[in-house]
């Protein structure tokens, strides 16, 4: 199975991302419901600008994060670790992402929080259901995938 396909299928079944940013040596993490865009390989989230993590991100920042399930046994562990960039969307980009986000999470229609894009440059997918410690790595723009 192609690495990005396996990652995308698993991410489509999850809904909470944890992401971390840093500013002047201070780290902060946050959680949010996400929409994953398979074509752009990007997460879309809503978060208020007044939050600590948004303030630390500014309009654009380096980001790292995870998506994981809560399995009861080690043999069922699956999860994603990533690094990349987070940025606040504006204009048409924001409008299109918000429409898609609202389709997945209709309750979000009541929120006015800005839309942010988390664009991973590297994704590591651990899937113990394929064998203990099985890892797949996707790198943006490299033209290669490591399994």
Curated annotation (Swiss-Prot):
Family statement drawn from the similarity comment of this UniProt entry: Belongs to the UPF0306 family.
HAMAP family named in the record: UPF0306 (MF_00764)
Transmembrane stretches, start-end: none
Protein name per its UniProtKB record: UPF0306 protein YhbP
Upper lineage: Bacteria, Pseudomonadati, Pseudomonadota, Gammaproteobacteria, Enterobacterales
InterPro entries hit by this protein: Split_barrel_FMN-bd (IPR012349), UPF0306 (IPR011194)
SUPFAM superfamilies, alphabetized: FMN-binding split barrel
Provenance organism: Escherichia coli O157:H7
């Amino acid at each position: 199975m192609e690495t990005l396909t396996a990652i995308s299928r698993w991410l489509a079944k999850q809904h909470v991302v944890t992401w971390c940013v840093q500013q002047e040596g201070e780290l902060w993490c946050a959680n949010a419901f996400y929409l994953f865009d398979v074509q752009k390989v990007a997460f879309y989230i809503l978060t208020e600008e007044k939050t600590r993590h948004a303030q630390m991100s500014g309009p654009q920042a380096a980001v790292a994060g995870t998506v994981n399930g809560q399995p009861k046994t080690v043999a069922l562990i699956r999860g994603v670790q990533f690094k990349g960039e987070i940025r606040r969307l504006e204009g048409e980009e924001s409008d299109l992402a918000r429409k898609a986000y609202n389709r997945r999470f209709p309750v979000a229609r009541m929120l006015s929080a800005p839309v942010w894009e988390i664009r991973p440059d590297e994704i590591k997918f651990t899937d113990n259901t394929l064998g203990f410690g099985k890892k797949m790595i996707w790198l943006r723009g490299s033209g290669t995938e490591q399994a």
